[in-house]
Regions:
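Conserved hydrophobic/aromatic beta-strand scaffold that supports enzyme active sites
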Residues: 107-109, 118-122, 139, 159-161, ...
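Short alpha-helical interface segments
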Residues: 8-21, 25-85, 91
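Short histidine-centered beta-strand/loop micro-motifs
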Residues: 111, 121, 130-134, 150-152, ...
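Short acidic-glycine-tyrosine-enriched beta hairpin
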Residues: 149-170
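Double-stranded beta-helix
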Residues: 181-209
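A short glycine-rich, His/Asp/Glu-containing loop-to-beta-strand
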Residues: 95-125, 130
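Ligand-binding loop in jelly-roll beta-barrel domains
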Residues: 166-190
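Glycine- and acidic-residue-biased ligand/ion/polar-headgroup-sensing regions
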Residues: 124-127, 134-149
Length: 209
């Protein structure tokens, strides 16, 4: 979990353009918050560009005059937007319509066209998520505040990657809570009495997606 190899794989996949909307958004936000990860992405970008330049038999794309106009307009439009990748999708992050799952825990599902589920999660100070595991991978990026679990403490710009072998019980810091961006490839599996209720809630909710 959280190995350098896993993080490098995520960044390289992003640089290669192999991701859908969910992981592209997640990784771009990770690079936005983490300067060290952004430097790695630049290295991968340069490597891929060099490899591409050495390929034979590939002709440069011929552009029309109208293509140039569209490109200039697009760049100008994007430059007027905030640098935060999330703000480009949902606007002002302070005006999110949070949905309460249980006391101290709120979420907001992002409008992306992808099989992976992408959510913003907001946990009040000291709030915990019951012990759980995952049927697929889970990616968590701390946007504000911090949380801790059995494997360490995670602050703004830190990323955690979990798989089916990991069980953890995240708890938001007691000072200012935690806001995270989360991707889950499949359903979350909770343990314990409260976990059983959440599993039932998740099962019922799946019929209304």
């Amino acid at each position: 979990m959280n190995s350098t190899a896993q993080k490098n794989e995520l960044i390289f996949g992003y640089s290669s353009g192999n991701f859908g909307e969910a992981k592209s958004l997640f990784t771009s936000m990770y690079l936005y918050l983490n300067s060290f990860a952004a430097k790695k992405a630049s290295i991968f970008d340069n490597m891929l560009a060099q490899n591409f330049s050495e390929l034979e038999g590939i002709e440069p794309k011929k552009l029309k005059y109208t293509d140039c106009i569209k490109k200039d307009y697009s760049e100008k439009k994007n430059n007027d937007l905030p640098n935060n990748p999330l703000s480009r999708i949902i606007g002002d992050l302070n005006n999110i319509d949070w949905k309460t799952v249980y006391k101290g825990f709120r979420e907001f599902k992002l409008p992306v066209n992808d099989n992976d589920s992408v959510k913003l999660i907001k946990m009040d100070p000291g709030t915990s998520v019951p012990l759980h595991s995952h049927n697929g991978k889970e990616y968590i990026l701390v946007l504000d505040g911090s949380f801790c679990d059995e494997y360490g403490e995670y602050n703004k710009g830190d990323m955690q990657i979990n798989d089916q072998q990991i069980k953890h019980n995240p708890t938001a810091c007691k000072s200012n809570g935690c806001v995270c961006l989360s991707i889950t490839e499949d359903e979350v599996v909770f343990f314990g009495k409260f976990g059983s209720a959440l599993n039932l809630f998740t099962f019922i909710k799946s019929f209304f997606k």
